[in-house]
């Protein structure tokens, strides 16, 4: 078999890659993870488990829900419905077809269910199986994710945003002294499950502990402890230790000495060792904890205390009479003076009391005695009364309710994460599979709460990322699915009980509509399922990586405080501290950091490099916020020597709580992978981010997402090196699916022959159909352009076509333009921007915007609507763009008001006169009346029609236009099929030729002589079909030919079948909405040139509006005659502190001057003044080691590379690791420019030099999606509000300018009485007045009369609603 690599003469595509001069110093040991894998992993891997065999599926996602809901049994346990397995059918339409036909991209879910029916013997109660039926049941269409991590719902692309919510588990807090006037801290605990009832425990101001369930009325915590089955003895013994006071005759009590309970104080009595009788300290002397520990260490175990010391202590067991065993006092009671006398009288020698730390109080004992419930039943009934007020109480109902609240897996679920968090916080060791509360949990929550009150341990930080987790798409949809299946379960049980179970099949029991409705509702209306921001590829990626704290189960805007929104130390490397919206959502909507990923428990992890004995390894470890707290972590820019050892005596490290410490190198556990891991994708695209103020960086990253894709794309000269990753992961550009060779290329498609051979050795073909002028969600233009040429060798995942806003595989949101910072006649006051006419003339910032218009022909009560060219009362001129069917031609230039699709609607008939009746009788039936309901171009829209789509209902005859579009599409399918076949045939027949040449013929077509040896010339005379007729002597060759023929036929058949399926789908008609006969969609593309009023911005938060377009000859220019493109105001810099833009401008200036220098060298080389070595030397000086791969190539390729950089040298200055000021100066010197980056500039109007040197350079600017064309409008006559009769406002209502209260004051202050009257009456809501004014204008008169404004009438009506009658009476005088 021949290797297909033999005929690769062309250069690999990788030769075309752009090389950037990189200023970064830190070697990257970890690649940026795929930027949209969060979405894909969560949905496809964890929820659907799509391409995994049934037996290998893990119990998670869809599998776990189905396992938990099934089996479903009926009330009498006769029928039992079990879940066996699930699988997905293939989708009916692909992604493109779904978005064109306004359908959802979804696959049918087929679940195999087994229905078992039992026979129960009424006497013995034994059960026997009566029958088993297994069946595959359709459970509705489940939306699938596209390869870019989005969903197509009703034809629009949507994204499900991940949600940040509080992790399940137990949390301890205090109220920060806000509740009680004294400022006393009241501690509380809250158990938050994944689903189920919340449990709160809290101290009140009197130090009694209460609990509440679901924020209902509070009860004593001991009621909860009794409800879980603890008696008074058990409660006291669990929470308190006991100590025994032994009677020492005539001396007092001997008791154990506990040094931990000693605080510094003066003794009121002597400190006496009970064992020896020695006095250690006299009364009045001071004892300290240190001294107490010393005595304890020297053997002081028991001390003597006075008789009355027992008063005020609490009994740790019942006090009994030694003689009669009668209970004198109950456990927990306080010993009083009377009780002490009884103890002395009865000569009780040992008294057990509770050990209570003097600094804290007997909280649980006090709560126990405040609680009136003395046993479990009373406690359960008390809880029942609070949760079900008004219902009759019985113990069974109370017990069942309490059990269901916290211990039933159906209704309560902590989730695995909740259990892990609970175990770690309470120091328990309960299995992770136990996802309900246990008795140990409740006992220990109370214990920890009391310890916190006593000052042991610290409260939890809610905003710590160890306490907040991410719910991604899969999990959000899983929760919806569970809701749907639980609802469905109820209907299944009802159906089981209703009918005769013996004759029922599983599909009769299941109603999939319930499930489908829930899923549909989530995708269409949920706050987290959002219309994808598709302005440019960056906005797509950012939207998919967004984390929202809002949404169901999350926070609400109004209630979120400052703490939740603030940046937390644990955000480092996980959530971007920069990128968040300005406005009310600030801090609630965040973006994931570039390198972050989400672990299986939903916590965000960040990568670190392991450090062993002060040596930095290349091992990368991902740590969550909880794990990170255990280690000392150094910065990525710590100095490392050649052997990988950390340099310096001390290293600055982060530790728990966001603090920094200096430690020795061997103590460091990890260091950051790269400084870029702190920020998000958008922020990592900003060069010199480290020199910008954070507020401006925030604006910069937000505005990059609003950049409109331009006609001509241009990657930034000054980038950060991340541009390629963003373009690749966004899905905007086209990636090669396999290694291969490019066979055909045109602007619409690329055909690549795959090099990975199948088992049969025949090649396969990839055909990439490029998107041409498609409308995005935000009406920007999606257009793909090939980057490869015929013969190029491409590798898997190479970029073979650029998409919107990409240039040579790098993201390109704007253009590089020559900028000067100087004031120019006040035209750049307040951030205005002055631009040169060249920018408009050469379409530098021109963008294409596509709008979609749709018309539906419906079946009405009076008859069907019709799409036609025959429209009543319309001139031929108005129909000039329509074809014979009444649909506009592609390529037509349209203006506002033009007809796009002609449509007529039947009109209800008015009663006819007798004369008309007579005429109808004579001349036959007149055609019924129709009215014009055509689709017109709305105001403010003009452009070129780029596409028309016609959809006809199944069974309705197609019109000429639909047939023409269909024919065009079929031709496209046929071309794809023929090209693929041609490549396969070329391969097959060249292989056959290699096999046959030199063989001896024993049978064959007429041209072949038996016994002849086959030659290449002889085979050229045969047709392809005759190749198969040849038989040769060699049996092995014949076998191989037989195999080739079989595979070739199979391949051909598969291609024909695929073609037939596509054609059939195309011709079968469409599923249109109810009542629609035909739908026509027209797409109009508009070119938007840059004009005054458009908003532009840089990447550093420097934004402004264009104020004026100046002729080139008036713009300032350089000494070599180059005219500046844009003039910006230097005052926009100092106060805003975004100095990054100046460094970018300087480096951009170096970039174009280095390019000029390279061009000069190439020119000299061509004129034979210098050799290639000088060029190589300069390139090495400029690029460093980066350029070695280019310099090893032939001379002509080096010159070709130099030509590529003739417009500007591309730099990469990574975030926080980029070029310093000195590097910029070095580049300017290398380019032969002044290191200040300033030049002499000449005024275009006067021809004189400006007084001072001016900063000039290349800067990357973006045109934002705030175009003046979409904002400006004017009103002549338009709609009025119904009640107030005032003109409406806003562009969509064709409204006017509001003349508000303050505007009235201005006219009053000016004394313009008549203007004011006109504004408040005829120009506003005086209905009669405006009609009269209109009449007088028509007659050519200039006077008007104003009446009563409608708002006055409204006010009178409001008075009347308050029963006050107001009349306006005009007296005759």
UniProtKB/Swiss-Prot annotation:
A molecular function GO annotation: ribonucleoside binding
A Pfam family reported for this protein in Swiss-Prot or TrEMBL: RNA_pol_Rpb2_7
Keywords assigned by UniProt, alphabetized: DNA-directed RNA polymerase, Nucleotidyltransferase, Transcription, Transferase
Record Gene3D superfamilies: 2.40.50.100, 2.40.50.150, 3.90.1100.10, DNA-directed RNA polymerase, beta subunit, external 1 domain (2.30.150.10), DNA-directed RNA polymerase, subunit 2, domain 6 (2.40.270.10), RNA polymerase alpha subunit dimerisation domain (3.90.1800.10), RNA polymerase Rpb2, domain 2 (3.90.1110.10)
Reaction it catalyzes: RNA(n) + a ribonucleoside 5'-triphosphate = RNA(n+1) + diphosphate
Coiled-coil boundaries: none
Any one GO CC term of the record: DNA-directed RNA polymerase complex
Alphabetical list of InterPro entries matching this protein: DNA-dir_RNA_pol_bsu_ext_1_sf, DNA-dir_RNA_pol_bsu_external_1, DNA-dir_RNA_pol_su2, DNA-dir_RNAP_su2_dom, DNA-dir_RNAP_su2_hyb_sf, RNA_pol_bsu_bac, RNA_pol_bsu_CS, RNA_pol_bsu_protrusion
GO biological process: DNA-templated transcription
PROSITE patterns named in the record: RNA_POL_BETA
NCBIfam families associated with the record: PRK00405.1, rpoB
Chain's role: DNA-dependent RNA polymerase catalyzes the transcription of DNA into RNA using the four ribonucleoside triphosphates as substrates.
Subunit structure: The RNAP catalytic core consists of 2 alpha, 1 beta, 1 beta' and 1 omega subunit. When a sigma factor is associated with the core the holoenzyme is formed, which can initiate transcription.
Family: Belongs to the RNA polymerase beta chain family.
HAMAP family listed in its UniProt record: RNApol_bact_RpoB
Name used for this protein in its record: DNA-directed RNA polymerase subunit beta
Phylogenetic lineage: Bacteria, Pseudomonadati, Pseudomonadota, Alphaproteobacteria, Rickettsiales
Gene (UniProt): rpoB
């Amino acid at each position: 078999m021949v290797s297909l690599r033999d005929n690769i003469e062309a250069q690999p595509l990788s030769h075309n890659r752009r090389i950037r001069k990189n200023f970064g110093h830190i070697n990257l040991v970890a690649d940026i993870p795929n930027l949209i894998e969060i979405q894909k992993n969560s949905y496809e891997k964890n929820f659907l488990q799509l391409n995994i065999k049934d037996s290998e599926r893990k119990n998670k996602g869809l599998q776990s829900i189905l396992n938990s809901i099934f089996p479903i049994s009926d009330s009498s346990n006769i029928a039992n419905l079990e879940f066996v397995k699930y699988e997905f059918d293939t989708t009916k339409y692909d992604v493109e077809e779904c978005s064109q036909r306004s359908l959802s991209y979804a696959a049918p879910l087929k679940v195999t269910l087994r229905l078992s029916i039992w026979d129960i013997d009424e006497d013995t109660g034994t059960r026997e199986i009566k029958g088993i039926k297994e069946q595959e049941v359709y459970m509705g269409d489940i939306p699938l994710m596209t390869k870019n991590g989005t969903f197509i719902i009703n034809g629009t692309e949507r994204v499900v945003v991940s949600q940040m919510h509080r992790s399940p588990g137990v949390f301890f807090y205090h109220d920060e002294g806000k509740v009680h006037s004294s400022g006393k801290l009241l501690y509380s605990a809250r158990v938050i499950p994944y689903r189920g009832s919340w449990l709160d425990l809290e101290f009140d101001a009197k130090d009694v502990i209460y609990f509440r369930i679901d924020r209902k009325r509070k009860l004593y915590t001991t009621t909860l402890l009794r409800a879980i089955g603890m008696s008074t003895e058990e409660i006291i013994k669990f929470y308190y230790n006991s100590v025994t006071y032994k009677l020492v005759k005539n001396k007092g009590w001997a008791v154990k000495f506990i040094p931990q309970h000693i605080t510094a104080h003066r003794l009121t009595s002597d400190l006496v060792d009970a064992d020896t009788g020695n006095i250690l300290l006299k009364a009045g002397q001071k004892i300290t904890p240190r001294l107490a520990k010393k005595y304890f260490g020297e053997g002081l175990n028991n001390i003597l205390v006075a008789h009355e010391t027992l008063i005020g202590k609490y009994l740790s067991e019942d006090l009994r009479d030694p003689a009669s065993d009668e209970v004198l006092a109950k456990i927990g009671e306080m010993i009083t003076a009377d009780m002490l006398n009884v103890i002395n009288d009865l000569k009780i020698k040992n008294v057990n009391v509770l050990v209570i730390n003097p600094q804290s109080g007997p909280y649980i004992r006090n709560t126990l005695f405040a609680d009136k419930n003395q046993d479990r039943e009373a406690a359960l009934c008390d809880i029942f009364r609070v949760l079900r007020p008004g219902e009759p109480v019985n113990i069974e109902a109370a017990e069942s309710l309490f059990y269901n609240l916290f211990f039933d897996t159906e209704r309560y679920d902590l989730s695995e994460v909740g259990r892990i968090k609970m175990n770690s916080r309470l120091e328990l060791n309960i299995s992770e599979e136990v996802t309900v509360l246990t008795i140990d949990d409740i006992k220990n929550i109370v214990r920890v709460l009391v310890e916190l009150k006593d000052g042991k341990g610290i409260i939890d930080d809610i905003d710590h990322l160890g306490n907040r987790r991410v719910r991604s798409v899969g999990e959000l949809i899983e929760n919806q699915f569970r809701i749907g299946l639980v609802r469905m379960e109820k209907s299944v049980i009802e159906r089981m009980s209703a009918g005769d179970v013996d004759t029922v099949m599983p599909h009769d029991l299941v109603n999939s509509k319930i499930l489908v409705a829930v899923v549909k509702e989530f995708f269409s209306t949920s706050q987290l399922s959002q219309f994808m921001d598709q302005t440019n590829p960056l906005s797509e990626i950012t939207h998919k990586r967004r984390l929202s704290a809002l949404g169901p189960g999350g926070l609400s805007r109004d209630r979120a405080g400052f703490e939740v929104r603030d940046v937390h130390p644990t955000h480092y490397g996980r959530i971007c501290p920069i990128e968040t919206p300005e406005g009310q959502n600030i801090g609630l909507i965040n973006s994931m950091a570039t390198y972050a990923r989400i672990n299986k428990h939903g916590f965000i992890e960040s990568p670190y490099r392991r450090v062993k004995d002060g040596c930095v390894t290349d091992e990368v470890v991902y740590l969550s916020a909880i794990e990170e707290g255990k280690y000392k972590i150094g910065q990525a820019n710590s100095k490392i020597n050649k052997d990988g050892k950390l340099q310096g005596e001390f290293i600055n490290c982060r530790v728990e709580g966001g603090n920094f410490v200096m430690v020795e190198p061997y103590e460091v556990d990890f260091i950051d992978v790269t400084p870029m891991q702190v920020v998000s994708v958008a922020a990592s695209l900003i060069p010199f981010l480290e020199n910008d103020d954070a507020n401006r960086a925030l604006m910069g990253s937000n505005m990059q997402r609003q950049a409109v894709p331009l006609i001509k794309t241009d990657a930034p000269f000054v980038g950060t090196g991340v541009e390629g990753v963003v373009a690749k992961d966004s899905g905007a550009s086209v990636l090669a699916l396999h290694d291969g060779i490019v066979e055909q290329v045109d602007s619409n498609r690329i055909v690549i022959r795959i090099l990975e051979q199948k088992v049969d050795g025949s090649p396969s073909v990839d055909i990439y159909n490029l998107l041409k002028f498609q409308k995005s969600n935000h009406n920007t233009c999606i257009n793909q352009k090939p980057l490869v040429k015929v013969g190029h060798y491409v590798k898997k995942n190479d970029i073979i076509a650029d998409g919107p806003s990409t240039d040579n595989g790098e993201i390109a949101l704007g253009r590089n333009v020559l900028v000067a910072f100087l004031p120019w006649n006040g035209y750049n006051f307040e951030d205005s921007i002055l631009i040169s006419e060249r920018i408009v003339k050469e379409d530098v910032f021109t963008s294409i915007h596509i709008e979609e218009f749709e018309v539906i022909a419906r079946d009405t009560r009076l008859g069907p609507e019709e799409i036609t060219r025959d429209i009543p009362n319309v001139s031929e001129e108005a129909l000039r763009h329509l074809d014979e069917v009444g649909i506009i031609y592609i390529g037509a230039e349209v203006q506002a008001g033009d007809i796009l699709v002609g449509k007529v609607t039947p009109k209800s008939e008015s009663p006819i006169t007798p004369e008309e009746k007579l005429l109808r009788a004579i001349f036959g039936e007149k055609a019924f009346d129709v009215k014009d309901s055509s689709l017109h171009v709305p105001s403010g829209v003009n452009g070129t029609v780029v596409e028309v789509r016609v959809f006809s209902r199944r069974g309705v005859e197609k019109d000429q236009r639909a047939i023409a579009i269909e024919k065009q599409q079929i031709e496209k399918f046929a071309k794809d099929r023929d090209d693929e076949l041609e490549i396969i045939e070329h391969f097959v027949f060249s292989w056959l030729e290699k096999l046959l040449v030199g063989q001896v013929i024993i049978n064959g077509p007429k041209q072949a002589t038996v016994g002849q040896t086959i030659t290449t010339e002889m085979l050229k005379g045969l047709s392809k079909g005759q190749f198969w007729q040849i038989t040769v002597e060699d049996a092995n060759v014949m076998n191989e030919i037989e195999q080739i023929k079989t595979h070739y036929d199979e391949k051909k058949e598969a291609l024909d079948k695929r073609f037939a399926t596509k054609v059939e789908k195309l011709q079968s008609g469409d599923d249109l909405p109810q009542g629609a006969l035909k739908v026509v969609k027209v797409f109009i593309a508009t070119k938007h040139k840059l004009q005054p009023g458009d908003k532009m911005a840089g990447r550093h938060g420097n934004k402004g509006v264009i104020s004026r377009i100046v002729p080139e000859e008036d713009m300032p220019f350089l000494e070599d005659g180059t005219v500046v493109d844009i003039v910006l105001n230097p005052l926009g810099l100092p106060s805003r502190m975004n100095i990054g833009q100046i460094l970018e401008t300087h480096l951009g200036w170096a970039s174009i001057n280095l390019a000029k220098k390279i061009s000069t060298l190439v020119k000299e080389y061509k004129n034979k003044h210098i050799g290639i070595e000088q060029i190589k030397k300069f390139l090495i000086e400029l690029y460093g080691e980066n350029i070695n791969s280019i310099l090893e190539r032939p001379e002509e390729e080096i010159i070709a590379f130099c030509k590529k950089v003739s417009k500007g040298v591309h730099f990469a200055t990574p975030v926080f690791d980029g070029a310093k000021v000195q590097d910029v100066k070095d580049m300017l010197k290398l380019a032969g420019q002044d290191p200040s980056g300033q030049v002499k500039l000449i005024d275009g109007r006067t021809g004189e030099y400006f007084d001072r040197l001016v900063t000039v350079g290349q800067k990357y600017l973006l045109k934002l999606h705030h175009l003046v064309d979409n904002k400006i409008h004017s009103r002549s006559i338009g709609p009025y509000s119904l009640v107030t009769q005032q003109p409406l406002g806003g562009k969509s209502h064709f409204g006017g300018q509001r003349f508000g209260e303050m505007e009235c004051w201005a006219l009053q202050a000016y004394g313009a009485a008549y203007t004011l009257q006109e504004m408040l009456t005829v120009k506003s809501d005086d209905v009669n007045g405006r009609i009269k004014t209109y009449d007088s204008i028509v007659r050519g008169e200039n006077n008007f009369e104003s009446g009563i404004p409608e708002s006055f009438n409204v006010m009178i009506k409001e008075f009347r609603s308050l029963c006050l009658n107001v009349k306006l009476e005009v007296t005759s005088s």
